[in-house]
């Protein structure tokens, strides 16, 4: 994993310079970096020092590449994965960076794909249903284990000393903004989509939180805050300390933080309802503007002003997309394929796409359920697992690859149909991210499966471009930026000339396969819990095995 920065001309949207910094610690999912303490299954942590390194290396790199005068830099925008949270002390220092807590896993950043709080999410949803909590429907009927409250419940239950020591539990996005400008201003995007906050009613009641765990009764006042700021606002000015580390001028405007998926919407020029954006990478987020709030089963959330001021913003998603393909390549692609790709001077992804693209639709006889990392929408269940149906002794890697690609496209089609059936129009489809940028084969499959033309982001770094747009908003017109999002998007948002159009004969064939996919989706997602029973047994046996190894 990495952090990325772009320097953008606010008048034209031209990306003048780009810099990338790989995270030193990457994703911590096996053992802690210093103590080497082993982590259980479904954990995904990060080290916050990596985030500061990104700022200290990428921003000076942008200035060096562009030869820009720091006086010309009018604003900074920050976006982040979410829900990605960390406990901090009263000085804003992450607890994992204090020696006494460095060996405690719960003191680290919990990445969005930390799924070890599924038990807590299940309990939260059960209690909320029993109490008829109104917020459930605005999250598609379920709160995901990826969101803030289940993760905080896990901390309170498994590491109460960490919960007690935390002066605040913050989204990483808000923490970075705090590091930049010294003000703790939480954004309405992560609060609304990930922390059960509403701009009219605030958070759920103290009584509800107490029913989850006694320690959580006063969580809003003790660990969170009701002081929430809208995306598009200015959080503050760059501190002298961070100015020294980045090479920028103290006082440079810093925007209220945002989420990587949501901030990409203006980057592709979307400023009105009816246009869905897919941000496609390891996972996929589906973003959509609306005129009013509609209850959509299995959506991740709907938040007023959550994406752009003046509109409600809808979010849905798939927990695993590109990670499927990475898994296949890591474990099941033969050496002969790797040598063939090397000989042709292309990546293994390109080779698999070429081979898969030469297959006829349905030729492999395979059908998959794209749940290798659970299901975010519309089933909202991290305990679901993947499935591949139809394999024979003749099945080849490219056939499995194509089946996985098609399954992710079917998952997106289910999301689109669910929104439409709930009264939320989707008339245009856009895509951004690494897959949209690099893989024509996958994008054509999506166009055929959804029967929609797909427009592609004009920037390979759509989240960073979107953040730059909000940085220009934070600066304001008096400082060379913009006062209104529509004006900023008109100058800075962009899409490519190339689009992917559905091929009629492919659409017809995929309709047949999609009907079969829906049968599997309903049966294994709602009717038969065999996946959960198998996962439970796996976890029990894994724990037993790990204990035996430790004793040995």
Curated annotation (Swiss-Prot):
GO terms for biological process: L-arabinose catabolic process to xylulose 5-phosphate. Its EC number is 2.7.1.16. GO terms for molecular function: ATP binding; D-ribulokinase activity; ribulokinase activity. It comes from the Bacteria. It catalyses: D-ribulose + ATP = D-ribulose 5-phosphate + ADP + H(+); L-ribulose + ATP = L-ribulose 5-phosphate + ADP + H(+). Pfam families: FGGY_C, FGGY_N. SUPFAM superfamilies: Actin-like ATPase domain (SSF53067). GO terms for cellular component: cytoplasm. InterPro entries: ATPase_NBD, Carb_kinase_FGGY, Carb_kinase_FGGY_CS, FGGY_C, FGGY_N, Ribulokinase. Pathway: Carbohydrate degradation; L-arabinose degradation via L-ribulose; D-xylulose 5-phosphate from L-arabinose (bacterial route): step 2/3. Keywords: Arabinose catabolism, ATP-binding, Carbohydrate metabolism, Kinase, Nucleotide-binding, Transferase. Belongs to the ribulokinase family. This is Ribulokinase. It comes from Bacillus licheniformis (strain ATCC 14580 / DSM 13 / JCM 2505 / CCUG 7422 / NBRC 12200 / NCIMB 9375 / NCTC 10341 / NRRL NRS-1264 / Gibson 46).
């Amino acid at each position: 994993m990495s952090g990325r920065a772009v320097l953008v001309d606010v008048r034209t949207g031209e990306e003048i310079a780009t810099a990338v910094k790989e995270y030193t610690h990457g994703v911590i999912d096996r053992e802690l970096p210093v103590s080497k303490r082993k982590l259980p299954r479904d954990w995904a942590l990060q080290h916050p020092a990596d985030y500061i390194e990104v700022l200290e290396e990428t921003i000076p790199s942008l200035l060096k590449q562009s030869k820009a005068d720091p006086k010309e830099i009018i604003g900074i925008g920050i976006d982040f994965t979410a829900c990605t949270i960390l406990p901090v002390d009263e000085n804003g220092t992450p607890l994992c960076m204090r020696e006494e807590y460095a060996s405690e896993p719960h003191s680290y950043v919990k990445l969005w794909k930390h799924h070890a709080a599924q038990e807590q999410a299940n309990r939260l949803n059960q209690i909320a249903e029993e109490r008829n909590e109104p917020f459930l429907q605005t999250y598609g009927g379920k709160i995901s284990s990826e969101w803030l409250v289940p993760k905080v419940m896990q901390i309170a239950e498994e590491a109460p000393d960490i919960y007690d020591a935390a002066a605040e539990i913050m989204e990483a996005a808000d923490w970075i903004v705090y590091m930049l400008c010294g003000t703790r201003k939480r954004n309405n995007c992560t609060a609304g989509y990930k922390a059960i906050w509403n701009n009219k009613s605030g958070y759920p009641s103290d009584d509800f939180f107490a029913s989850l765990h006694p320690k959580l009764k006063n969580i809003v006042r003790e660990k969170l805050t009701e002081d929430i700021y809208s995306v598009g606002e200015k959080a503050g000015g760059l501190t002298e300390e961070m100015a020294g580390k980045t090479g920028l001028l103290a006082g440079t405007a810093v925007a209220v933080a945002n989420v990587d998926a949501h901030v990409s919407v203006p980057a592709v020029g979307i400023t009105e309802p009816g246009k869905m954006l897919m941000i496609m990478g390891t996972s996929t987020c589906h973003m959509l503007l609306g005129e009013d709030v509609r209850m959509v089963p299995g959506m991740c959330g709907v938040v007023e002003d959550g994406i752009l001021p003046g509109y409600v913003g809808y979010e849905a998603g798939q927990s695993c997309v590109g990670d499927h393909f990475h898994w296949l390549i890591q474990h099941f692609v033969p050496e002969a394929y790797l040598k063939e790709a090397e000989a042709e001077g292309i990546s293994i992804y390109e080779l698999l796409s070429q081979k898969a693209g030469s297959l006829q639709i349905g030729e492999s006889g395979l059908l998959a359920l794209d749940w290798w990392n659970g299901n975010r929408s519309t089933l909202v269940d991290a305990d679901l697992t993947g499935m591949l149906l139809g394999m024979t002794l003749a099945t080849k890697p490219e056939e499995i690859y194509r089946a996985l690609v098609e399954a992710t496209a079917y998952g997106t089609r289910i999301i689109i149909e669910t929104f439409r059936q709930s009264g939320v129009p989707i008339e245009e489809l856009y895509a951004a991210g690494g897959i949209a940028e690099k893989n024509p084969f996958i994008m054509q499959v999506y166009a055929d499966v959804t029967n929609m033309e797909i427009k592609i982001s004009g920037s390979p770094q759509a989240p960073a471009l979107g953040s730059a747009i909000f940085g220009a908003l934070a600066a304001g017109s008096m400082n060379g930026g913009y006062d209104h999002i529509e004006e900023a998007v008109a100058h800075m948002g962009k899409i490519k000339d190339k689009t992917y159009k559905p091929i009629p004969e492919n659409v017809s064939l995929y309709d047949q396969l999609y009907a079969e996919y829906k049968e599997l989706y309903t049966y294994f997602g709602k009717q038969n819990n065999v996946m959960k029973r198998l996962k439970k047994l796996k976890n029990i046996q894994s724990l037993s095995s790990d204990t035996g190894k430790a004793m040995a």
